[in-house]
Amino acid sequence: MLEDYYPSTTSYYHGGIDDDLYTAKWGMVMTFLDLNDSSLTPFEGTHFALIGFKSDKGVYINNGRVGAVESPAAIRTQLAKFPWHLGNQVMVYDVGNIDGPNRSLEQLQNSLSKAIKRMCDLNLKPIVLGGGHETAYGHYLGLRQSLSPSDDLAVINMDAHFDLRPYDQTGPNSGTGFRQMFDDAVADKRLFKYFVLGIQEHNNNLFLFDFVAKSKGIQFLTGQDIYQMGHQKVCRAIDRFLEGQERVYLTIDMDCFSVGAAPGVSAIQSLGVDPNLAVLVLQHIAASGKLVGFDVVEVSPPHDIDNHTANLAATFIFYLVQIMAQHS
């Protein structure tokens, strides 16, 4: 039995029901699935599993604005309203949440990793609704556990921050997940392939830039780089990064986008990547056929305005799933 795991029992769609897939919405089509059901066998074809990670403990430890614990419900509500474009050959299952208000951050990350591995064993592509960016380490661990030790797993992070902070004194938090991945790779004598899109210089200290400069395998583009390059050159840079890689894990921190597009985040951003450009880049990553799982994190509903940020996060999920279904 999976720990800290609660299957979904309540629909987030409250509109009319229509059996016609040409007019259906996500909330009509998505089906509940209990990962603890021992009778389940691996699914055939391309299907997705949506799980919430109800934790912003890492944000609290990192002195950010808490509230991301409420994000899975907010994103589900927005996603449920979107039109269904996936026909009858692709299914998105809502498998519930990882939740444990009295559990430690490390315990919740471990529980998420086991749920992710369970999804992969069932041939379901994971979509995780954070949660703070501590979500990423649990998601990554689960993906790695589903692979053999020699298998590669590159990481693309759309984020204003490197999230490579040391954690020997503070302990793990929302800003340390990728340093934990890096340290795991060093311990296993693997190269950590990590590409950050949307870095803002005013959000990262010189220690982090120095660490990146000295670390083989880590690349980044600033938000200003992306603005100047345009999406086609950014996509070519991603292609070069993914050359020779068979798998990539994608994580989207909603503070990558300006406060005008994403006001409800743990750490607001005055600058930021254009969401329209981001959609084109995300679709390109999905079209590589290498994307094995993704998450959207750091949505903070108590700080959102008219669900702008939750809706944008749901929009990214809509387009990523659409392209992944075509290229898997």
Swiss-Prot record:
Q: Which reaction does it catalyse?
A: N-formimidoyl-L-glutamate + H2O = formamide + L-glutamate
> Which SUPFAM superfamilies does this entry report, sorted A to Z?
Arginase/deacetylase
What pathway does the annotation place this protein in? Amino-acid degradation; L-histidine degradation into L-glutamate; L-glutamate from N-formimidoyl-L-glutamate (hydrolase route): step 1/1
Pfam families, alphabetically?
Arginase
Which cofactor(s) are needed, names only?
A: Mn(2+)
GO molecular function terms listed in the Swiss-Prot or TrEMBL record: agmatinase activity; formimidoylglutamase activity; manganese ion binding
Q: Which GO terms fall under biological process for this protein?
A: L-histidine catabolic process to glutamate and formamide; L-histidine catabolic process to glutamate and formate; putrescine biosynthetic process from arginine, via agmatine
Enzyme Commission designation: 3.5.3.8
Tell me the residue numbers annotated for binding Mn(2+) 2.
D159, H161, D253, D255
Q: Locate the residues binding Mn(2+) 1.
A: H133, D159, D163, D253
This entry's comment on the bound cofactor is: Binds 2 manganese ions per subunit.
The molecule here is called Formimidoylglutamase
Q: Identify the species of origin.
A: Streptococcus pyogenes serotype M1
